[in-house]
């Protein structure tokens, strides 16, 4: 079996180590495709774990999340598989919201909200990570390829990018009891 290559160009990373340009990951295989085509799920998992733990082990996260691809990766990662990986394998506890309003409500209660959102746009679906920004805004990672500091209110993201109101979102609540 052919070994899968893994090389993330430094131009795909923000200065603080997040993956912000999925389009540059043509050399990273994911399922039967490339991370540039269908890798937003593992990229979101990496970005969230990088925020929470400082990890830079991209390849391990990519290969672990690859187990949950749909149609050999053509449709990216199964949402429940991504949750399973982050919850059971990485010890993250989440609150699930399904709408912008639910996400805003839960984020307002959190001191430093972060999480992963799956949204639908004209060309399909896309996972992004959000972490705390400045002045009560959120910083979005891998939303606009190459933008390292994309900070704005959630309603502006919905207005500019989101087609359907259903947006499954995992908002980090803390470690699971087993991981504590």
Q: Model-predicted segments: where are they?
A:
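Generic detector of well-ordered alpha-helical segments enriched in charged/polar residues
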Residues: 59-66, 83, 104, 155
């Amino acid at each position: 079996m052919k070994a899968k290559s893994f090389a993330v160009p430094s131009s795909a990373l923000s200065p603080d180590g997040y993956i912000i340009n999925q389009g540059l990951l043509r050399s990273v295989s994911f399922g039967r495709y490339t991370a540039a085509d269908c890798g937003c799920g593992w990229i979101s998992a990496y970005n969230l774990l990088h925020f929470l733990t400082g990890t830079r082990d991209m390849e391990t996260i990519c290969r672990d999340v690859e187990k949950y691809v749909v149609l050999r990766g053509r449709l990216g990662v199964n949402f429940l598989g991504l949750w399973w990986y982050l919850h059971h394998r990485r010890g993250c506890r989440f609150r699930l919201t399904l709408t912008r309003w639910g996400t805003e409500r839960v984020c307002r209660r959190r001191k430093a909200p972060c999480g992963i959102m799956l949204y639908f746009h004209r060309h399909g679906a896309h996972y992004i990570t959000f972490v705390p920004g400045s002045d009560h805004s959120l910083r979005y990672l891998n939303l606009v390829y190459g933008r390292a500091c994309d900070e704005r209110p959630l309603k502006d993201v919905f207005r500019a990018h989101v087609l359907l109101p259903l947006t499954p979102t995992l908002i980090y609540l803390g470690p699971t009891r087993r991981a504590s």
